[in-house]
Amino acid sequence: MTEKPRIISAVISDLVTDQRVHRAALSLHEAGYPVLLVGRQRKASLPLDQRPYAVRRFRLWWEKGPLFYAAFNLRLFLFLLTKKADILLANDLDTLPAVWLAAFIKGSKVVYDSHELFCEVPELTHRPRTRNIWKRIERFLLPKLRNAYTVNESIASIYRKEYGVDFKVVRNVPLRLPAQAIPALTRADLQWPGDRRVLVFQGTGINVDRGAEEAIRAMEFLDDFLLVFVGGGDVYEQLRLEVSSKGLSDRVIFLPRQRPETLRAITRLADVGLSLDKDTNLNYRYSLPNKLFDYIQAGIPVIATSIPEVQRIVEQYRVGGIVSDLRPEALAGFIRDTFSDPGRIRTWKENAQLAADELNWDQEKTRLLDIIEHAR
């Protein structure tokens, strides 16, 4: 029997909450590939649960900024030089320099997973000098790639056109968790009021222009609702301050990042999931966020903005409504109108449960395995 190629997958994020890299590593391991997943450990990271594949986490002095990215790539590069691997899998542009250079020296194959339109994220578009550095790296490295994939067809098409690289698509759909793996939580366990309709807003990267601020401001007009944020991100603390300053602490609560099983348990207790990304940059315009599929897997309807990839899923599977106006009163009105028709909510829930049978990792992972099997 031929031995499977050894794979090292590198990502700059926290391995505890990055579901995409976990799903990929798990599927590769189950397919017989020896897998080592390399990431980082923040000071506030949760303990890493037991996983069937090998894991290595780097601790660094810096947690953000140029020194952090430089230190991570240097550490990763030196680490990769000491390890045997046939395939090096770079997750996003911020690991690709180290991965590509190590692969060039060692003769390994490079596979690239672009989780987003990296150089168009607002954190970079608002800082043109930093963006220019990353864009130069992208222009230098991407044309050299032979094995690449991304999260949706819109982003794949942009990269194909710009760099002439045949990007495949592996969507960000979740694992189908067995019922016994999901904690048996109730609203009472979480101390949620029993007489409120609950809106959930997920995200490990709740950053600027994700619609979180608008959701909070809409709560001024929704006194019989509860808004639950689950996750973290660049604006998470600012959101807490805004809720406090507006006196909305009885209507808006914040939960930290959760393990996937706990996140699923919390999400399915909500009535509706919110996906309110704004079309303020190319990355958001063409995004297909994890939370959309997490809501569907949890069997709850979705209220989403009209960014193309999200709208396509919501309308194709009829799992929710599309809101076009995020001004506080307008958004609140849309939410109230949504709940004014119990039959519609019930239909959306039923459709979400049906869509979950198709929009899950068991179906999607075959695309990843095909890319790895035919890596050049």
Where are each of the predicted segments found?
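Conserved donor-binding/catalytic core segment of Leloir-type glycosyltransferases
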Residues: 7-10, 193-220, 228, 349
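Donor nucleotide-sugar binding/catalytic pocket of nucleotide-sugar-dependent glycosyltransferases
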Residues: 39, 56, 135-185, 189-192, ...
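Nucleotide-sugar donor phosphate/pyrophosphate-binding loop at the beta->alpha transition
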Residues: 67-71, 108-109, 118-141, 208
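Membrane-proximal helix-turn-helix segments that form the acceptor-binding/catalytic region
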Residues: 74-82, 101-105, 129-150, 162
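Nucleotide-activated donor-binding/catalytic signature segment of Leloir-type glycosyltransferases, i.e.
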Residues: 237-265, 272
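Short hydrophobic beta-strand element within catalytic cores of glycosyltransferases
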Residues: 272-275, 294-304
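Conserved acidic donor-binding segment of nucleotide-sugar-dependent glycosyltransferases
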Residues: 317, 321-328, 337-343
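A short, well-ordered alpha-helix in the C-terminal region of glycosyltransferases
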Residues: 330, 337, 344-358
